[in-house]
């Protein structure tokens, strides 16, 4: 037991370095996933049929196939077509594309939940659809979308562990490398799991804090 504890202490700098990389990868994947997801949400609400179908097909593909398969096709499959990516860009692209499929549905539902009368009221005072979306609809939709988007981010933090399969040096990969040297399988994966748990717990606490702040503002707007 004492040897295992000492191993964890000695390995902690490497695990924490991997945890920082995990958070960076998650933040990048969430950012680009939100940008692309917002575009897909607008396409899903487009009055043009083919535009809606493209967005629906994209969402269906990336939500209906395993993330690990998507990462493998990007990192191991694209070189067959002359496109070679380093592990980190490949992971970022895969995580972003996958996240966008989920955030697009969240954003679309949030925007659709806003009373359509607000669109009509804004049009009656001369606002363009884009002005209405930006000034009136999105601020309200953001409140609706915050909880599910926060949950998506927490899930993404855990999903980055799949990037270890394409040699990205995030937390799980660091645990794998240490395990291969020490053969302490249970100890190292338990340590990595506890770090994931701490990150998820902190992120959940931040989510609750911001939700409470928004609810307080709604009850007592000043």
Show the residue positions of the predicted features:
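Transmembrane alpha-helices and adjacent helix-loop boundaries
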Residues: 1-222
């Amino acid at each position: 037991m004492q040897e295992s504890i000492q191993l964890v202490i000695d390995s902690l700098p490497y695990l924490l370095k991997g945890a920082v990389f995990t958070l960076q990868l998650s933040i990048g994947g969430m950012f680009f996933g939100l940008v692309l997801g917002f575009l897909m949400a607008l396409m899903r609400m487009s009055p043009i049929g083919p535009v809606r179908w493209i967005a629906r097909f994209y969402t269906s593909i990336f939500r209906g196939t395993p993330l690990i398969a998507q990462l493998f096709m990007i990192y191991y499959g694209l070189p067959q077509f002359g496109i070679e990516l380093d592990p980190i860009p490949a992971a970022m692209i895969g995580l972003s594309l996958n996240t966008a499929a989920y955030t697009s549905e969240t954003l679309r539902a949030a925007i659709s939940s806003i009373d359509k009368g607000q669109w009509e009221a804004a049009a009656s005072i001369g606002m363009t659809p884009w002005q209405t979306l930006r000034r009136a609809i999105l601020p309200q939709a953001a409140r609706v979308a915050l909880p599910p988007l926060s949950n998506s981010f927490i899930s993404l933090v855990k999903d980055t562990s799949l990037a270890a399969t394409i040699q990205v040096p995030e937390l799980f990969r660091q645990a794998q490398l240490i395990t291969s040297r020490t053969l302490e399988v249970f100890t190292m994966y338990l340590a990595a799991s506890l770090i994931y748990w701490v990150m998820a717990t902190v992120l959940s606490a931040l989510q609750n804090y911001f939700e409470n702040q928004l609810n307080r503002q709604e009850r007592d707007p000043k």
